[in-house]
Amino acid sequence: MEPTQVAENLVPNQQPPVPDLEDPEDTRDESPENSDTVVLSLFPCTPDAVNPEADASASSLQGSFLKHSTTLTNRQRGNEVSALPATLDSLSIHQLAAQGELSQLKDHLRKGACPACTCLSGNNLINKPDERGFTPLIWASAFGEIETVRFLLDWGADPHILAKERESALSLASMGGYTDIVRLLLDRDVDINIYDWNGGTPLLYAVRGNHVKCVEALLARGADLTTEADSGYTPMDLAVALGYRKVQQVMESHILRLFQSTLGPVDPE
């Protein structure tokens, strides 16, 4: 079986699926009886956009309801169920980073370090992209492996690298709601408003995942509330469409503070 792509352009051919909004915080389903992939969706498809009796002309219009998914497979993570389970020694640097296997990751980096490099920092591997352009740091950020992220950053991993479809460590950490990792990356001066091929920004991903603390952290560091994704959604539009009241309240409070700061102190006279 060919490995599932890490990022897929899922433009619906017939009708867009309706996302499960009952448990918005749980964006990952690793149950082997359901699927061998982990799919993280960005943009919602509202119920009125789904018409089971839609004809061919309507189907073409539904292409505007673009669903951006990042698919991270169990095979790529090295935990695929098989007759011959993978050992840690057989995993790639990307799989080790995704699983947070720090000891093995360090050994892997040392073995691949440049012979002329006395610090053995593994510079020729630490920013190595996989077939989709994902670096070890991007993988670790996507799966919330904060100690691995901290280690990779300390060893010189570049947090500014973008994958082939402009996915970033910050966007994937925001998508997963990994607020501490988001802060670590922002401390390295990454672009807080970086956008991917679909116009998705870290703030849009955090809102889509209903990650309140992550939204707060991004807003506190200056994330742009006015940016629109290619679907036409702003962060506020997205929160309203999905019924995420707490996220909406956080953004409303932020807007109010910005407005008050522009007015300055009120003269009592």
UniProtKB/Swiss-Prot annotation:
An example GO biological process term is: positive regulation of transcription by RNA polymerase II
UniProt entry tagged with the keyword Transport: no
What segment(s) does the record annotate as region Disordered?
1-36
Which tissues is this protein detected in according to the database? Expressed primarily in thymus, lung and testis.
An example molecular function term from Gene Ontology annotations: histone deacetylase binding
Q: Which UniProt keywords apply?
A: Activator, ANK repeat, Cytoplasm, DNA-binding, Nucleus, Phosphoprotein, Repeat, Transcription, Transcription regulation
One Pfam family name is: Ank
Q: What's any one GO cellular component for it?
A: cytosol
User: What are the start and end residues of each ANK repeat?
Assistant: 88-127, 132-161, 165-194, 198-227, 231-260
Q: Does the keyword Phosphoprotein apply?
A: yes
InterPro entries per the UniProt record, alphabetical: Ankyrin_rpt, Ankyrin_rpt-contain_sf, DNA-bd_RFXANK
Q: How is it modified after translation?
A: Phosphorylated by RAF1.
* Cell compartment(s), UniProt: Cytoplasm; Nucleus
Let me see what the UniProt entry remarks about domains: Interacts with RAF-1 via its C-terminal ankyrin repeat domain. The same domain also mediates its homodimerization. The third ankyrin repeat is required for association with the two other RFX subunits; RFX5 and RFXAP. The three central ANK repeats mediate binding to the PxLPxI/L motif of RFX5.
Q: Note the PANTHER family from the entry.
A: ANKYRIN REPEAT FAMILY A, DNA-BINDING PROTEIN RFXANK
The entry describes its oligomerization and partners as: Forms homodimers. The RFX heterotetrameric complex consists of 2 molecules of RFX5 and one each of RFXAP and RFX-B/RFXANK; with each subunit representing a separate complementation group. Interacts (via ankyrin repeats) with RFX5 (via PxLPxI/L motif); the interaction is direct. RFX forms cooperative DNA binding complexes with X2BP and CBF/NF-Y. RFX associates with CIITA to form an active transcriptional complex. Interacts with RAF1. Interacts with RFX7.
**Function per UniProt:** Activates transcription from class II MHC promoters. Activation requires the activity of the MHC class II transactivator/CIITA. May regulate other genes in the cell. RFX binds the X1 box of MHC-II promoters. May also potentiate the activation of RAF1.
Protein known as:
DNA-binding protein RFXANK
The record lists the organism as Mus musculus
**Gene that produces this protein:** Rfxank
